Structure formats: structure tokens, C-alpha cells
Amino acid sequence: MGASNLHTPFSTPALKVCGMRDPENIRAVAAIKPNYMGFIFWEPSKRFIQNPIPEIDPNVQKIGVFVKATPNFILKTIQENDLQGVQLHGGETAQDCKVLRDALDKEVGLSKPSLVIIKAFSVADQFDFSSLAAYEAYCDYFLFDTKGKLPGGNGYTFSWKLLSAYPSNTPYFLSGGIG
């Protein structure tokens, strides 16, 4: 499966480019070697990937982005697309993440590194960081995205000063209107 650094906290910023769907664009972005590329497996999204993911550099980790998906759908999608991780973007509870972590660990077994779970949280003018503690045992990374009409990809920026109160050792991604 993937690289051995799947669970290594970032010593330098990591780049995850999300919403890839056009094969030519996927190859072009993969050529610049971001750490991760996100592929949307939520049909209502305008960035929903309908084509098979083309072959890309194995050092670029493929992450499936899911919104309120069942563990069975996620596992099937991982196998069909050789994903190295998942991003949960649909209001999943810590218990949902535990169920998925258990299913992923059972599926992968001891011979391969476990698949990454990234849990996304929508951030508005404030955020209750104490809510993260329940997720820490099951999620490898958090992702903070600006609250908007859609579960993600709204293109808005929240006040990053909120992250100065971040209490966790779990590494995180920053998302929302960055580019």
C-alpha cells in the first residue's frame, strides 16, 4: 500500500490538493508531487470524480473524500481506487470514526500500514477545540475548513487566529480559500 510516513507528524508543511477529477489535470498536479491528492466520492459535488483515477506517482498519497458514506461504501471505494486514506467531511461522530478505523484496520491487516483517516471540521467565527479529544484515538489528521453552504470546497477563509488555541498533538490541515 502506501508510504511508511503515513502517520508521521508534519515536520514541514504538507500539501494536499483536493477536488481532482480530470485525468490530464490529475497527472499534471501529481507531477509537482504534492503529499496528498484528494478525490471527491460524493455525487452532489461538482468535483465528484466519475472516471477511474489515473496512475500517479506512488509517493503522492490518494485520499478519498466522503460525506456521510457507509463504511462498506468507503471500503469498496478504497479497494477500487487503491486509496491510501480517507477524509470524512460529513458531520461524522467520533463513534463513526471508530467504526471506520476498526473496519480499515481489519481490512488492511498487519502486513500493511493502516490507512489514514482525516476528519474535517467546519469552522465559523469560533470553534470548540475540546470536541476534538473524542476523535484523537481514531483520526490521524484533522482538517479545518470554513463553514459554508456545502460540506467543503466553499472557497472561504476563516480567521486562522483561532488555531492559536489548538490544544491537540494531532497534526492538521488548513483548508478553505487558501489559493
What are these regions (language model features)?
Residues 1-107, 114-179:
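Conserved N-terminal beta1-alpha1 strand-loop-helix module at the mouth
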